[in-house]
Amino acid sequence: MKPIKAVIFDMDGVLIDSEPVYLHHQYTHLKPSYPWITLESMYPLVGISGQEYMPFMAKLCRRTDDAAFRQEMDAMNAGCRVYYPDILRKEVRPLLHELKQMGLQVALASSSSRECIEQVLTQCKIRELFDCIVSGHEFTHSKPDPEIYRFTMDKLGRKPEECLIVEDSTY
């Protein structure tokens, strides 16, 4: 087995504990207009890909996935204000520093938008600890498709057997 030379992190659910915050925001926003929605019915949103999000939400809300519905969902998501240092996992900063001190490359491969990624890393003051940052919005296929990981490894100049991926998803 070759030694690990790079560590690639997911962001939501790994670096930041964002899923409960996002889920609660969406639930409290949707419940008045869609009273049949329960918090439990929204659990599949945790870890959902960008491509699956709108079809899932349309089905959940019993709506057509059209421009008006997408506008409603975009407005809801834009209204979610999070102070990311509050949800940064406490072990993240020391771990990133230790990995860098060990001479390892550190990368981020997240399904989140570039804008969201930059906001999280900047607010948490960890941006400079990453050698490579990749947004899933730059790809045709979302996770679990390995395209984002292959691209990240290529940017790092690494082979799969030289990389460790830290991900919270079960796929």
Show the residue positions of the predicted features:
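Glycine-rich phosphate-binding loop signature in dinucleotide/nucleotide-binding domains
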Residues: 1-2, 101-104, 156-162
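N-terminal helical cap/lid subdomain that shapes the substrate entry/recognition surface
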Residues: 2-98, 102
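Conserved hydrophobic packing residues within short motifs/helices of P-loop NTPase cores
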Residues: 8, 107, 164-166
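Conserved phosphate-coupling serine/threonine residues in phosphotransfer and NTP-handling enzymes
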Residues: 14, 110-112
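Small/polar loops that bind or transfer phosphate-bearing groups
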Residues: 18, 45-46, 108-109, 167-168
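Small-residue (primarily alanine) positions within well-ordered alpha-helices
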Residues: 25, 107-109, 152
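Residue-level detector of short coil/turn "hinge" positions at structural boundaries
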Residues: 37, 64-65, 106, 128, ...
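Substrate-recognition "cap/lid" segment bordering the active-site pocket of phosphatases
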Residues: 85, 113-165, 170-171
